[in-house]
């Protein structure tokens, strides 16, 4: 709902915040279309009619299908994904709506070899980070904000520290999800769906990591930010947007 941004967004959902003349979600949809994605499912919650009004169908974005999560006030992002699951018939890309990022993030995920992958970045220092913990497939040195691209198996995803594990990167909010993984996530959600249910999709991925191999892909120098509070918004304007439009 973007409560921490209410002084900026007013009644606008976060995904409709404008940067460089485009809303966050429209920019993402353009990126998707440029990568050959022809259909997108948009799950709405707060002020869902605003999305319908803003996202008029045109040739620059994929064909849109809107799904409204009626219990958005009492649920986290996993329930939004659960609501959309009946409309997903093939492996898909999962994108959070409050992201400002460079376009190479998408082909990095799309071209990853394997049905599932969670995109990670190097250290951003933006605050409110969600960390991906895991083990590297290959022995490599260097800190997580290096320019290297690294892949590995996820051991956990959390804001909380795991002293026994190593931080491999920060969760970006862009993933490639197979129907097989989606079904397992939804099965877990059914078991834990007493309302209010504020768990997010990445928590279910984290839960499943002990039972199945789910990889991360870290692009150490990826330019991006989520926009979840005032400091994120200011960082997006002053640091991220200028690097995207230079």
Model-predicted regions and their roles:
Residues 22-92, 193-195:
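Conserved N-terminal catalytic core of the sugar/cofactor nucleotidyltransferase
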Residues 102-194:
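Conserved core of the sugar-phosphate nucleotidyltransferase
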Residues 11-27:
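Short catalytic helix/loop segments, enriched in acidic residues and glycine
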Residues 59-131:
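Conserved beta-loop-beta/alpha segment of the NTase-like Rossmann-fold superfamily
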């Amino acid at each position: 709902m973007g409560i921490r941004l209410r002084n900026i967004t007013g009644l606008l959902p976060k995904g409709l915040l404008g940067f460089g003349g485009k809303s966050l979600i429209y920019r993402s949809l353009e990126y998707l279309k440029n990568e050959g994605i022809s259909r997108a499912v948009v799950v709405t919650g707060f002020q869902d009619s605003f999305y319908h009004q803003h996202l008029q169908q045109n040739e620059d974005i994929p064909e849109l299908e809107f799904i409204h999560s009626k219990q958005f006030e009492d649920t986290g992002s996993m329930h939004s994904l659960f609501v959309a699951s009946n409309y997903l018939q093939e492996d898909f890309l999962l994108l959070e709506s409050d992201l400002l990022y460079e376009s190479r993030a998408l082909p990095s995920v799309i071209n990853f070899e394997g049905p599932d992958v969670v995109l990670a970045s190097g250290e951003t220092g933006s605050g409110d980070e969600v960390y991906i913990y895991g083990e590297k497939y290959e022995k490599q040195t260097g800190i997580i904000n290096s320019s290297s691209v690294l892949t590995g198996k996820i051991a956990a995803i959390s804001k909380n520290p795991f002293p026994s594990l190593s931080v491999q990167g920060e969760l970006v909010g862009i993933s490639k999800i197979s129907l097989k993984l989606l079904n397992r996530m939804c099965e877990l959600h059914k078991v834990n769906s007493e309302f209010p249910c504020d768990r997010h999709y990445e928590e279910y991925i984290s839960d499943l990591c002990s039972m199945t191999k789910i990889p991360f892909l870290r692009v150490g120098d990826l330019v991006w930010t989520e926009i979840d509070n005032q400091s994120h918004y200011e960082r997006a304007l002053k640091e991220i947007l200028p690097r995207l439009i230079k």
